[in-house]
Amino acid sequence: MNLPRRVSTSLPQAHVFTRRSFKSLKFAGESLDSSNSPALIHGIHLFHCPDVLGIVAKISECIASRGGNILSADIFVPENQPVFYSRSEFVFDPAKWQRMAMKEDFLKLAKMFNAKRSAVCVPALDPRYKIAILASKQDHCLVDLLHKWQDGKLPVDITCVISNHCRGPNTHIFRFLERHGIPYHYLDTSIGNKREEEILELVQDTDFLVLARYMQILSGNFLRSYGKDIINIHHGLLPSFRGRNPAKQAFDAGVKLIGATSHFVTEELDAGPIIEQMVERISHKDNLQSFIMKSENLEKQCLANAIKYYCELRVLPFEPNKTVIF
């Protein structure tokens, strides 16, 4: 998978770890008095590399040497695997540590440890991720994302909405998009023509795509041509109940938990690495309609969470088909 491309006091206790028996560790730096440091802004650093001694010390040194202070650090070293994952949040003075210098410092760190992934984000300075949303007839996830975006709860810029379902100018979605200057593209699809070339042309400048109940299977050729991450919402608790109508499948199976799954899109249907899952208990009193209603509520929150995790640099690949979510 392709994860965020943007490339990346002190922790005195972290320097004493010469051996680590932990699977995961979270620790926080000293708090800062914001009233005495009005110029400090927030940064995030994500790191994935082969595990060797001294990584935590070097990350701390990189930030502290520029006058920064780590507020929190999340570290994961899988048992019996020489792999290191970390996510650090820090504050710094942009007058003392300019954005380009920060990029170069973290690039040096990445080269030092032969990092597989090194990313840094400064939300106050960096442009937001650009996304396109693909949706079909059911619009509960699309509407929820648009409202969250309007309320400032999704740190993205929506370049366009693409749908294979026609929505007239008097629909609430069309009016919302028109009011906010977001283009709406209706591309009617068929079994023989999924309009993938046209979609590719519309989304070429995006950072990643979101499938908000887009009921079309994207081809392997599309995935390779786009070459970036695509986040999907599945209205079922994967890996169970793949494919169409998972709510009906789950209802017929008599499950006691209903769920929703947000995952990366791969060539295998509903089998990509999972980013987020949410569940709700149901009972014998639920009918199929209440089943679906509960599922839709889960889908909205699950998809929004996955997008937020991705934008906040919380997602890293782990093993062939898993993720680390900080």
Predicted features by range, described:
Residues 5, 17, 76-326:
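One-carbon transfer enzymes
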Residues 30-38, 121-125:
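Flexible hinge/switch segments at interdomain interfaces of large molecular machines
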Residues 36-39, 80-82:
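Short, flexible turn/loop "capping" segments at secondary-structure junctions
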Residues 46-55, 96, 135:
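Short, surface-exposed ligand-recognition loops at beta-strand->loop->(often short) alpha-helix junctions
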Residues 52-72:
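Short amphipathic alpha-helix segments
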